[in-house]
């Protein structure tokens, strides 16, 4: 794991040294001295705009021979227009620096920050750079037995010199804790589905949360049947692996404080059931539990900080498999709420899992606010691509706050519509509702949201986050490799911290 230290004295032993320069291409007094030590390499580089323009995110790595004859590397990072810098951009810059250092096989990095940059103190700026680098250091290669030497290389340490290392270290410690929660979310999402069965996943939740003071209850199929969870159980009945409902309760606030409930879809593997998916890219359905992973990761982050709030998490863990015992198109299930649902398509299973999970959360904990998170529909990816998750809500203030925080942490949300006409599209001739709409291909994400909305009680503020397009990526980003993104943890952690 990447080691990040904050120090009061500069070290001359680091292999790489990071220099920040904005689009004005001016050297302050500190950089002038450093430039002289390195034979004017910094000033020569920025004078040649074909090499370096100072635009945001531009990284230039230059080898330099110091007086001792040793080779050092100057890592010049562009800030662009300092007035346009945001916390998210600074974190991403930290990730880019780590990735370039890794590519150049630079094992130790030094970074000096003693001046305010734009509106950010040196301590805040340094902690954000460190956070981005730490997030970018994530790897999932536990099943690789033949890694090449280049693939094995990792930056060992980053040493950051600021004018108040103690304060900077405190700021980073919180960000590191949140990043480690993101790593859990990525890890469990990246795990192959033959490894992370509902039972194994539930055990991992217990192992990581109970030491943090979170009460965890793992409910099996017998108890779910007694509770009347016909919708969730119907999804999992085709699998030989028993479905689980995992309930997490963190009581950091006072007894009379309101509770927020997070509910996650945890379809461990989704074949589509009898309504079988095409085989192409079906392996990616191991990520169909990304919503549940985001919920667990958020509770790790909240409990790890010992935040003074009350929060519960409920995740339904199932496998949607075809078999002689699998749910059939046309089946009618009775949900925990007592409402019935006609299952017209067994591949619209996530909303069935959430129906019972959100109802359970409301019945047991009486939350003021429910936020469900799910890789729910392919339609949201058609609408928003891989840039935004969809946000549906019955409360404008709740939606606005979530969207604002999403912009701040670069886990973006786009408000999607709810309307009575969408709701009418899920009426069934033989049950209270159907699990798909009556107009093929129309408003798929909105239809799914309305299905869940029918299980939200009057007076409860609710938001549904459809993260199907952003939970995993087929390409690396500044903050991590391709695969599971860990989307939702930083968004929900900050929302909870600031607004509850």
UniProtKB/Swiss-Prot annotation:
Q: Function, please?
A: Presumably involved in the processing and regular turnover of intracellular proteins. Catalyzes the removal of unsubstituted N-terminal amino acids from various peptides.
InterPro entries membership:
Leucine_aapep/pepB, Macro_dom-like, Peptidase_M17_C, Peptidase_M17_leu_NH2_pept, Peptidase_M17_N
Report whether Endoplasmic reticulum shows up as a keyword of the record: no
Give the protein's cofactors: Mn(2+)
Gene Ontology BP terms: proteolysis
**Gene name for this UniProt entry:** pepA
**Protein name in UniProt:** Probable cytosol aminopeptidase
Superkingdom of source: Bacteria
Q: Which residues form the active site?
A: 277, 351
List positions binding Mn(2+) 1: 270, 347, 349
Q: What family does this belong to?
A: Belongs to the peptidase M17 family.
Catalysed reaction, written as an equation: Release of an N-terminal amino acid, Xaa-|-Yaa-, in which Xaa is preferably Leu, but may be other amino acids including Pro although not Arg or Lys, and Yaa may be Pro. Amino acid amides and methyl esters are also readily hydrolyzed, but rates on arylamides are exceedingly low; Release of an N-terminal amino acid, preferentially leucine, but not glutamic or aspartic acids
Free-text comment on the cofactor: Binds 2 manganese ions per subunit.
Instruction: Return the EC number.
Output: 3.4.11.1, 3.4.11.10
UniProt keyword rRNA processing present: no
Single GO cellular component term: cytoplasm
Keywords (alphabetical) are: Aminopeptidase, Cytoplasm, Hydrolase, Manganese, Metal-binding, Protease
Residues at which Mn(2+) 2 binds? 265, 270, 288, 349
EC class name: hydrolase
Which Pfam families does this chain map to?
Peptidase_M17, Peptidase_M17_N
Q: Which CDD domains match?
A: Peptidase_M17
Q: Which NCBIfam families match?
A: PRK00913.1-2, PRK00913.1-4, PRK00913.2-2, PRK00913.2-4
């Amino acid at each position: 794991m990447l080691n990040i230290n904050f120090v009061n004295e500069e070290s001359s032993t680091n292999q790489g040294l990071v220099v920040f320069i904005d689009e004005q291409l001016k050297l302050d007094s500190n950089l002038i001295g450093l430039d002289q030590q390195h034979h004017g390499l910094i000033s020569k580089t920025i004078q040649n705009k074909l090499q370096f323009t100072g635009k945001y995110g531009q990284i230039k790595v230059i080898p330099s021979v110091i007086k001792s004859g040793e080779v050092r590397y100057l890592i010049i990072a562009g800030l662009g227009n300092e007035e346009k810098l945001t916390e998210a951009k600074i974190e991403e810059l930290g990730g880019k620096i780590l990735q370039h250092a890794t590519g150049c096989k630079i094992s130790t990095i030094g970074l000096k920050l003693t001046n305010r940059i734009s509106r950010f103190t040196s301590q805040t700026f340094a902690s954000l750079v460190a956070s981005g680098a730490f997030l970018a250091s994530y790897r999932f290669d536990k099943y690789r037995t033949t890694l090449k030497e280049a693939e094995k290389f990792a930056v060992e340490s980053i040493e950051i010199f600021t004018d108040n290392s103690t304060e900077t270290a405190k700021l980073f410690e919180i960000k590191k804790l949140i990043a480690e929660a993101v790593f859990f979310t990525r890890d469990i999402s990246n795990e192959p589905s033959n490894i992370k069965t509902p039972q194994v996943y539930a055990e991992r939740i217990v192992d990581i949360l109970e030491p943090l003071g979170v009460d965890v209850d793992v409910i099996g199929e017998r108890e779910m049947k007694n509770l009347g969870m016909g919708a969730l159980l119907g999804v999992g009945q085709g699998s030989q692996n028993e479905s689980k409902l995992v309930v997490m309760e963190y009581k950091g606030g006072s007894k009379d404080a309101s509770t927020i409930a997070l509910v996650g879809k945890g379809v461990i593997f989704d074949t589509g059931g009898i309504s079988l998916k095409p085989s192409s890219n079906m392996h990616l359905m191991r990520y169909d539990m990304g919503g549940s992973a985001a919920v667990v990761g958020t509770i790790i982050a909240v409990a790890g900080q010992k935040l003074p709030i009350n929060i519960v998490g409920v995740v339904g863990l199932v496998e949607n498999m075809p078999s002689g015992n699998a749910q059939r198109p046309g089946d009618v299930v009775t949900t925990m709420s007592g409402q019935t649902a006609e299952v017209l398509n067994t591949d619209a299973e996530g909303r069935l899992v959430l129906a019972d999970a959100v109802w359970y959360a409301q019945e047991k904990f009486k939350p003021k606010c429910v936020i469900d998170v799910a890789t729910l529909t392919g339609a949201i990816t058609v609408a928003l691509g891989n840039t935004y998750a969809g946000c549906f809500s019955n409360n404008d203030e709740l939606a606005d706050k979530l969207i604002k925080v999403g912009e701040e942490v670069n886990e973006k949300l786009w408000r999607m519509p709810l309307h009575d006409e969408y709701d009418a599209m899920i009426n069934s001739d033989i049950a209270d509702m159907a699990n798909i709409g009556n107009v093929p291909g129309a408003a798929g994400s909105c239809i799914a949201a309305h299905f869940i909305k029918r299980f939200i009680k009057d007076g409860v503020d609710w938001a549904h986050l459809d993260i199907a397009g952003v939970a995993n990526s087929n390409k690396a980003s500044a903050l991590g490799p391709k695969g599971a993104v860990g989307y939702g943890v930083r968004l929900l952690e900050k929302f909870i911290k600031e607004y509850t």
